[in-house]
């Protein structure tokens, strides 16, 4: 049972002190959490030290999100980040999987970022396959994983670079009941959410020809300044 955790606190930004990380870890364990996705970038070593000590399982990933560029410097940076992440975290027993991408596909909005981001499907599939193979080369002992957006088309493309054992597990970011409507907030609504999650997972299992899928993001947005 896991959660995503950002390295961020009000007043500190990304430079979260270790005592506040302990506070976060205590809260997660009180919730019954035993797995963490260090979203969406490698965290400081103290986070993984705590996970080692507490027996937490960790999904560690590079900040390769949404878009691929045709620029060679962009592609080189992604692969360098991957190698650095694996080599820095290799000796942490808590880390059980390396994440190679998060929601990377071909959104129509990519054109707004410039012509370098207008890539074709073959380029995307070829490059992401090479990223997965690089991760396997760097570490043969851990799972290679990824997260994808809740979209049939995006996952069909993603499945093309995931085949032949390139990627061990794929997760889908499913915000059912938050980014989709639910009829009520009672038992009927909960059943509706459960049924929708099961339906989507079964659909994506078929897309990837997989026996299991991860839910890599879930829940709802929150704001400490908003109260019911």
Where are these regions (language model features)?
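Active-site-adjacent substrate/metal-binding segments within catalytic domains
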Residues: 1-67, 71-108, 144, 207, ...
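Extracellular glycoside hydrolase catalytic/binding regions
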Residues: 113-228
């Amino acid at each position: 049972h896991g959660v995503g955790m950002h390295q961020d606190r009000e007043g500190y930004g990304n430079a979260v002190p270790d005592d506040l990380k302990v506070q976060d870890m205590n809260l997660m364990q009180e919730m019954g959490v035993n797995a963490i996705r260090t979203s969406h970038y490698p965290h400081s070593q103290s986070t993984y030290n705590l996970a080692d000590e507490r027996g937490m399982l960790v999904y560690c990933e590079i900040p390769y999100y949404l878009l691929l560029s045709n620029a060679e410097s962009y592609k080189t940076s992604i692969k360098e980040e991957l190698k650095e992440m694996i080599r820095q975290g290799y000796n942490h027993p808590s880390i059980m999987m390396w994440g190679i991408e998060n929601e990377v596909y071909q959104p129509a909005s990519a054109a707004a970022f410039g012509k370098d981001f207008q890539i074709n499907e073959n380029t995307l599939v070829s490059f992401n396959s090479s990223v997965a193979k690089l991760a396997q080369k760097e570490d043969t002992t851990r799972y290679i994983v990824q997260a994808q957006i809740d979209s049939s088309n995006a996952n069909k493309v993603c499945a093309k670079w995931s085949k032949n054992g390139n990627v061990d597990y794929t997760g889908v970011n499913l915000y059912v009941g938050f980014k989709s409507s639910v009829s009520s907030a009672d038992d009927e609504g909960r059943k509706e959410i459960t049924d929708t999650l099961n339906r989507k997972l079964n659909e994506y299992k078929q897309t990837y020809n997989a026996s299991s899928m991860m839910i890599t993001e879930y829940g709802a947005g929150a704001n400490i300044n908003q109260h019911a």
